[in-house]
Design a protein with these regions (language model features):
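Active-site rim elements
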Residues: 139-150, 297-305, 377-385, 443-454, ...
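Mid-domain catalytic core of redox enzymes
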Residues: 325-438, 467
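Active-site/ligand-binding neighborhood in enzyme catalytic cores
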Residues: 176, 183, 207-328, 335-338, ...
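Short glycine/proline-rich turn/loop motifs
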Residues: 24-27, 71-73, 133-141, 287-300, ...
Length: 559
C-alpha cells in the first residue's frame, strides 16, 4: 500500500491536501466495491496510516511551524562553539544540518547551562559554599532555571515540537494562592489572604470610587452622558457593584462556607476594608498584578514534561559527538586565519583552532577570560550586569497545599525575603511533591544567597511556615541555587538600560572579527529560553552568510 501511495505522490507531486484522491485511488486498486459510508471510513484510516509513513520516507515535505531554511553547504568549515547551553547547542544543531563541522566546549560536566532541572543526584558547588547533592525522590524535581514557556514564544514551542519534547500546561496564575504581607498593621498583616479576595476587593473599591466620581462629574473626560453611563455600567459589572454603585460582598471572592447539597446555599465572605488592605501593605509593589498583566506571563503558559532541561537533554543526544564537557575556556584569540581557544580539561591545558567561533558564555564569566576583542566589545562584556537571583526546592512527604488548601499550581506572593512560593504544575494529586520555597531577586537574593546551604533551608522553612504551618511536619529534603554564586553562570540573566541597549548591546550584535556572540544577552528576550533560540538562529544565519558569501538576514522566513 505504501509503495502504491509513493508512486502516486511522485507522479502527481501531490501534498497533504490531496491525500483524499490518493485514498480513493489506492482503495479502488486494492479493495472490492464498497458503500459510500464504508469507503469514507476506510479512506480516513488509509490516510492516517500512509501520511506518517510517506513523511518518514521523504515522499512528502513536512510543513514546520517556524521553518529556518538556509541554502548552501558548510562542508569543510569548522565552527567552534563556546558554551553548551541552549544557545550553543541550538547553533550546533542548525549548523550541522548545513554540513559544518562543529565543536562545543562546555565548562560544566553537564549541558543546558541555566536551563537546569534539579532532580535526584543533581549536584552543584557555589562560590564559598559546600557541595550539594539532591536527594529528591525519583521522579520529583524543580526547575532551577527557566520554568515557563509563554504561548507566544513560538520558536521555543517549535523546537519542542521538532525535537519531540512533550509539554504541559504551566499554571502561572492561581487566584486560590496567597498574598502574605509581613509587618504592616491592622487585621490583614502577618496573615495569608487568598489572592482572589484582595483582587476582587481592590477591583470593587476602585470601581466604586471611579463610578461615583463619574456620576458626580468629578472626572475630566470628554464624553457624552450616554457614554459616561456606559462606563459606569461597565464598572458596576467589573467591580461587582450593587444598584447604588457600592461594592458589596459577592461569590467572586469566595465563601466562608462553600455551597453544597440540600439547604446548604453557602456563606459569602465579607469584603476586607480598603483601609485594612492598605495598612497591611497589600497594595505595595510586592503585590502588584505583574504576574497577570505582563505580556510574557499571560496565560496560556507551558513547561516541558519531566523538567525543562529535557529540551537541553534532547539537543545533547543529537550532538553527543561534538560536545566536550569539563572544558573550561581560559583564552579566546582572533587570528588571521580564524580563532584560537585555550581551555583546561582534566587538569590539562589544551588548544583548539577553528574558522569561526560562536561565544555563548555569560558575560560575567567571559569578563574573566583572556581575549583580544575590540574596546567596544570588551566594555560591553565588563559592564553589562546580570541579575542576582535564587531558588530553593523543598520536598514534602504530603502535598498539603493541594489536600488541605486546594492550591493547585500558581504562585504565592510575599513582601519578605521569600518573595514568591511556586507550587508545582505537575503530578497533581500525587502523594509527595516539590515546591519552590523561595524565588527572589536583587538584594533579597544576595542576602539569602550569602547563607550556608543549611541556613537557606532553615530560612525557607521558618518563613514558609508563617504561610503554611504544615511545613515542619511534612518537610523532607531541600536543594538551593543562587545563580549569581554559581560558577560558569554568575547571574540569572542580563540587565540592560535604555542607554546600554544603544551601546553595549549593539556591540555584541556584531562579530568581533572571527568571533560571534549568542545567548539571551544578545536579544530583547533576556531571561527567556526564546532568547537563546532566537540568538542562535540569528548567529547561524550571520555565520552561514559569511561562509557562503550570501546576503542573509534573520528571520529568514515570515513564519
Amino acid at each position: 500500500l505504501i509503495f502504491i501511495c509513493g508512486i502516486v505522490v511522485q507522479v502527481f507531486q501531490f501534498h497533504q491536501e490531496n491525500l483524499t484522491f490518493i485514498a480513493l485511488l489506492t482503495t479502488r486498486l486494492i479493495l472490492p466495491p464498497v458503500s459510500r459510508r464504508s469507503f469514507l471510513k476506510k479512506s480516513g484510516l488509509l490516510v492516517g496510516a500512509a501520511y506518517p509513513a510517506m513523511l518518514a520516507l521523504g515522499m512528502l515535505k513536512s510543513s514546520p511551524a517556524h521553518s529556518f531554511e538556509l541554502n548552501g553547504s558548510g562542508e569543510g568549515k569548522h565552527i567552534l562553539i563556546l558554551g553548551g547551553g541552549l544557545a550553543g547547542m541550538t547553533s550546533a544543531y542548525e549548523l550541522t544540518k548545513l554540513g559544518y563541522r562543529c565543536t562545543i566546549l562546555e565548562a560544566r560536566q553537564r549541558t543546558g547551562g541555566r536551563c537546569w532541572s534539579v532532580r535526584k543526584n543533581s549536584t552543584t558547588q557555589e562560590i564559598d559554599h559546600s557541595v550539594q547533592t539532591a536527594q529528591f525522590d525519583e521522579g520529583l524535581y524543580f526547575n532551577a532555571g527557566p520554568s515557563r514557556i509563554p504561548h507566544h514564544h513560538q520558536l521555543t514551542l517549535h523546537y519542542c515540537r521538532e525535537l519531540g519534547v512533550p509539554v504541559e500546561i504551566y499554571n502561572n496564575v492561581n487566584e486560590g494562592a496567597y498574598f502574605f504581607s509581613e509587618g504592616g498593621s491592622g487585621p490583614l498583616s502577618n496573615k495569608k489572604i487568598r489572592i482572589r479576595e484582595i483582587h476582587n476587593d481592590v477591583r470593587g473599591y476602585t470601581s466604586e470610587l471611579l463610578a461615583k466620581a463619574i456620576d458626580q462629574e468629578h472626572v475630566d473626560m470628554a464624553m457624552s452622558k450616554e457614554d459616561a453611563q456606559k462606563v459606569v455600567e461597565y464598572l458596576r459589572a467589573e467591580g461587582g457593584l450593587d444598584i447604588d454603585k457600592l461594592y458589596k460582598a459577592s461569590a467572586r471572592r469566595g465563601y466562608i462556607d462553600a455551597p453544597g447539597a440540600g439547604e446548604k446555599a453557602g456563606t459569602i465572605a465579607d469584603p476586607h476594608k480598603l483601609a485594612d488592605i492598605l495598612h497591611a501593605g497589600l497594595m505595595s509593589p510586592d503585590f502588584y498584578n505583574v504576574a497577570e498583566y505582563t505580556y510574557e506571563l499571560q496565560m496560556t503558559m507551558f513547561q516541558a514534561k519531566g523538567g525543562m532541561d529535557n529540551i537541553a537533554k534532547t539537543l545533547e543526544k543529537k550532538l553527543e559527538k561534538v560536545i566536550t564537557l569539563g572544558a573550561e575556556v581560559s583564552s579566546i584569540e582572533n587570528t588571521e586565519k580564524g580563532v584560537k581557544v585555550k581551555y583546561k580539561q582534566n587538569q590539562q591545558e589544551k588548544m583548539i583552532e577553528a574558522d569561526v567561533c560562536i561565544c555563548t558564555i555569560p558575560l560575567p564569566v567571559l569578563s574573566n577570560i583572556h581575549h583580544n576583542f575590540s574596546d567596544d566589545v570588551s566594555r560591553a562584556i565588563d559592564f553589562v550586569p546580570y541579575i542576582n537571583t535564587g531558588k530553593i526546592g523543598l520536598q514534602f512527604k504530603r502535598r498539603f497545599w493541594e489536600e488541605d488548601e486546594h492550591v493547585f499550581g500558581g504562585i504565592t506572593h510575599t513582601n519578605n525575603d521569600l518573595t514568591q512560593i511556586f507550587y508545582p504544575s505537575y503530578d497533581y494529586l500525587a502523594k509527595k511533591g516539590v515546591l519552590i520555597g523561595y524565588y527572589n531577586f536583587n538584594d533579597k537574593a544576595v542576602k539569602v544567597g550569602s547563607l550556608s546551604n543549611a541556613d537557606r533551608e532553615k530560612f525557607a522553612l521558618e518563613k514558609g511556615a508563617m504561610i503554611h504551618p504544615q511545613y515542619p511536619k511534612e518537610f523532607e529534603k531541600s536543594f538551593s541555587v543562587s545563580w549569581h554564586l554559581t560558577p560558569h553562570s554568575l547571574g540569572g540573566w542580563a540587565l540592560y538600560t535604555g542607554e546600554s541597549r544603544k551601546t553595549s548591546y549593539k556591540a555584541l550584535l556584531q562579530p568581533d572579527k572571527n568571533v560571534y556572540f549568542a545567548g539571551e544577552h544578545t536579544t530583547y528576550l533576556t531571561a527567556w529560553m526564546a532568547g537563546a533560540f532566537e540568538s542562535a538562529r540569528r548567529t547561524v544565519a550571520d555565520v552561514h552568510a559569511r561562509m557562503t558569501e550570501q546576503r542573509i538576514s534573520y528571520p529568514t522566513t515570515k513564519n
